Swiss-Prot record:
Intracellular or extracellular location(s): Plastid, Chloroplast
GO cellular component, one term: ribonucleoprotein complex
Protein name: Small ribosomal subunit protein uS11c
Source organism phylogeny: Eukaryota, Viridiplantae, Streptophyta, Embryophyta, Tracheophyta
NCBIfam families linked to this entry: PRK05309.1 (NF003698)
Protein family: Belongs to the universal ribosomal protein uS11 family.
Subunit structure: Part of the 30S ribosomal subunit.
């Protein structure tokens, strides 16, 4: 009879002291800047907020999904508000410009949250891309 050779690395690993659905933050801590640009991209499905320095280098970004919202709740105004608060608190901005893109429901809520956070806003720009009769839009959905 042959002896069975014990496996060195088994597939089952025992994790001590961990909850089953524990989430861990793998992000590095964001750089602290005093002046920057806040980009708000509000689509119909999500709200993404990116904070950059004046040269355009990304310092921190946040979205409704990374704040813990799932599926259709990512498109809500409350998700946009929480995303904006999360991004500004992490970076610690004092003065900023705001660039708003898109027509989603989180757009106005994110803008209100940025204004109430105590950041001095130098300008608010709407940079939503508007065609000057360029490409033909996709056909309308029929439900």
């Amino acid at each position: 009879m042959t002896k069975t050779i014990p496996k060195i690395g088994s597939r089952k690993k025992v994790r001590i002291g961990l909850r089953r659905n524990a989430r861990f933050s793998l992000r590095k801590s964001a750089r602290r800047i005093t002046k920057g640009v806040i980009h708000v991209q509000a689509s119909f499905n999500n709200t993404i907020i990116t904070v950059t320095d004046p040269q355009g280098r990304v310092v921190f970004w946040s979205s409704a999904g990374t704040c813990g919202f799932k599926s259709s709740r990512k498109a809500s105004p409350y998700a946009g508000q929480r995303t904006a608060v999360d991004a500004i608190r992490t970076v610690g901005l004092q003065r900023a410009e705001v660039m708003v893109k898109g027509a989603g429901s989180g757009r106005d809520a994110a803008l209100r949250a940025i204004a109430k956070s105590g950041v001095r806003l130098s300008c608010i720009r709407d940079v939503t891309p508007m065609p000057h009769n360029g490409c033909r839009p996709p056909k309308k959905r029929r439900l």
